[in-house]
């Protein structure tokens, strides 16, 4: 008897090709499932759930597969969006995509897969592992690899997941979509955070977190060099949007004192205080047993390079990460993912004291 695979379909080209490839294999009963996590946007928003669902309908019709829709809007706001706002208000820089994968796609969506009597869940993520029992590894396309975003998802939650695109390059996926005549073949990839769309981040955040004007201080001179509308609008290492003139070198956000509502900056992109030799990580998720010390590499943000490091477990359940070479703009609240080669060992949330606290 054929097993049933539920394809998480977003209306984009990646999930469309996943459904196409699985249907073409002839080994599965393929069922599409569209997940709505966010309502329609206002006049400046770009998160177009209705248009995306129409594309899912078109692909399902082309492939002659059944499809369903499920709304997790309420749960998304409670488990992802509310935390996103809370973390920003407290001075952190969270990653909602990592949260969404852990809390929604590979938790609530998995429960829906069981309801539909699915044997597997297939997604368009560019990574490898899952149902093959190997945990999680990078996708072979270095420009599209998404293992970073899944590093916080428990291994058990991936045990029935298929990643058909993990061994493919994006150019190949586009080519397959075009040759198959899929309706989404030329559709642009979605970018950014779904609930923000193309709006400037500050204009979005100020709808939910009130402005709180304060001083911008040069950390080296302790002189006030400007004013800000809220320390929560800034992230460590940020250069743009400071509105500070008259400086010989560009200014970068070094630290934030949320209690005193101060943003500290330094001048020059290579200022030594912008670099950290170590960090702490909490809310850890491991795909392999943690050894002491674990010699590996770490990625402190999605597009950052791997940095060689040693990971030491601490008694309180966190880990200390010591880098071989100091790393720039280590940001509290961001996700850190650990690797050995292409294998993702796990991940956690960065917890590092601000410079002014040291």
Curated annotation (Swiss-Prot):
Q: Name one GO molecular function term.
A: tRNA binding
Q: Which GO terms describe its cellular component?
A: cytoplasm
Q: What does this protein do?
A: Catalyzes the 2-thiolation of uridine at the wobble position (U34) of tRNA, leading to the formation of s(2)U34.
Question: Which residue ranges does the record annotate as region Interaction with tRNA?
Answer: 144-146, 301-302
Q: What reaction is this protein's catalytic activity?
A: S-sulfanyl-L-cysteinyl-[protein] + uridine(34) in tRNA + AH2 + ATP = 2-thiouridine(34) in tRNA + L-cysteinyl-[protein] + A + AMP + diphosphate + H(+)
InterPro entries in the cross-refs = MnmA-like, MnmA-like_C, MnmA-like_central, MnmA-like_central_sf, Rossmann-like_a/b/a_fold
Keyword RNA-binding appears in the UniProt entry: yes
A biological process term (GO) from this entry? tRNA wobble position uridine thiolation
- Residues carrying the site annotation Interaction with tRNA: 125, 334
Q: Which UniProt keywords apply?
A: ATP-binding, Cytoplasm, Disulfide bond, Nucleotide-binding, RNA-binding, Transferase, tRNA processing, tRNA-binding
Report the active site residues.
Answer: 100, 194
Q: By what name is this protein known? A: tRNA-specific 2-thiouridylase MnmA
CDD domains, per the entry = MnmA_TRMU-like
What PANTHER family does the database record attribute to this sequence? MITOCHONDRIAL TRNA-SPECIFIC 2-THIOURIDYLASE 1, TRNA 5-METHYLAMINOMETHYL-2-THIOURIDYLATE -METHYLTRANSFERASE
Major subcellular location class: cytoplasm
User: Region Interaction with target base in tRNA: which residues?
Assistant: 95-97
Q: Where is the protein situated, by its record's location annotation?
A: Cytoplasm
Protein family = Belongs to the MnmA/TRMU family.
Disulfide feature: 100-194
Pfam families assigned to the protein according to its UniProt record, in alphabetical order: tRNA_Me_trans, tRNA_Me_trans_C, tRNA_Me_trans_M
